[in-house]
């Protein structure tokens, strides 16, 4: 018996994903007239979405009810275009609609980071860097990442996880100035993993734990948002060096598509660059978050 059927039921996942994507669109977003009529529920009607996708209302209704059996790639592409899905959302829709094909190709496996990758991380001394895997598990890091975010080596392996740190460690709210965005990103990554590995027991357990312990996680999980890890800017606060504005890049590792290398850097000659230099000189004693509570 599955402990968390909501995560593993691909039909329910497909239904909710399509419904939430449809609800976020208004007629004017897709060039349809609205005529000022009041809508009992937000977003496009099913018949409007079916019209945009070029399928019958009955067919789309069956799909939104979770019946994706034998749906063609062309139809999924048309629905993705009608829903204005991002590339990440389009890929997620395909995985949800064709879970049997996915099951044949993927099975959740034990995560290991190659020793050479840790050696590479150790050689990176001027910017924080770490490797993250499925479920937002933190697999390896360098000394400056430990000084910035916390010495994850002091945590139990199961707790070296961004989702647990973000939602269960209150110090993360002090470190991430825009904590809400960080939390939303993390949940969207977990949603992507759930689409790729719907039968991963560790992912199911993680989602179940966070759903019980965090109301904020439950609310974000219900949005069904999905995003790929990418690049951007993070505003952080460190108790010793103050505010930091750091750009980050995510590099997908070629021999394991589930693992990514993340590196943070500051603008040259900025206050943030000076802050990183101070952290590098102080080392792990400067840890801010992610270490066990004292």
Specify the residue positions occupied by each region the protein language model found:
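A short, Lys/Arg-rich alpha-helix, primarily the initiator
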Residues: 1-44
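Amphipathic, well-packed alpha-helical segments that form the structural scaffold of globular domains
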Residues: 19-26, 94, 98, 122, ...
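An N-terminal domain-cap segment
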Residues: 29-43, 102-118, 122-123
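Hydrophobic protein-protein interaction segments
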Residues: 115-294
């Amino acid at each position: 018996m599955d402990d968390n059927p909501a995560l593993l039921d691909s039909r329910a996942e497909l239904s909710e994903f399509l419904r939430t994507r449809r609800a976020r669109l208004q007629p004017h977003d897709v060039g349809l007239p609205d005529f000022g009529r009041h809508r009992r529920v937000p977003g496009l009607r099913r018949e409007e979405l079916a019209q945009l996708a070029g399928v019958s209302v009955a067919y789309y209704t069956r799909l939104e009810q979770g019946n994706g059996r034998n749906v063609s790639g062309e139809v999924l592409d048309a629905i993705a275009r009608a829903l204005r899905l991002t590339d990440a959302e389009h890929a997620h829709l395909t995985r949800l609609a064709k879970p049997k094909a996915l099951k044949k190709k993927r099975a959740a496996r034990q995560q290991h980071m190659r020793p050479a990758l840790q050696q590479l991380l150790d050689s990176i001394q001027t910017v924080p860097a770490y490797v993250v895997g499925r479920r937002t598990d933190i697999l390896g890091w360098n000394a400056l990442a430990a000084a910035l975010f916390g010495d994850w080596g002091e945590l139990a392996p199961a707790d070296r996880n961004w989702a647990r740190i973000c939602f269960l460690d209150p110090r993360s709210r002090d470190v991430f100035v825009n904590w809400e965005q960080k939390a939303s990103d993390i949940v969207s990554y977990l949603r992507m993993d759930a689409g790729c590995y719907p039968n991963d027991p560790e992912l199911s357990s993680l989602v179940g734990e966070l759903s019980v312990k965090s109301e904020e996680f439950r609310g974000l999980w219900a949005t069904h948002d999905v995003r790929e890890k990418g690049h951007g800017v993070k505003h952080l606060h460190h108790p010793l060096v103050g505010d930091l504005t750091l750009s980050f890049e995510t590099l997908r590792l070629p021999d394991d598509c589930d693992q990514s290398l993340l590196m943070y850097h500051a603008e040259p000659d900025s206050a943030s660059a000076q802050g990183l230099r101070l952290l590098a000189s102080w080392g792990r004693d400067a840890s801010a978050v992610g270490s066990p509570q004292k």
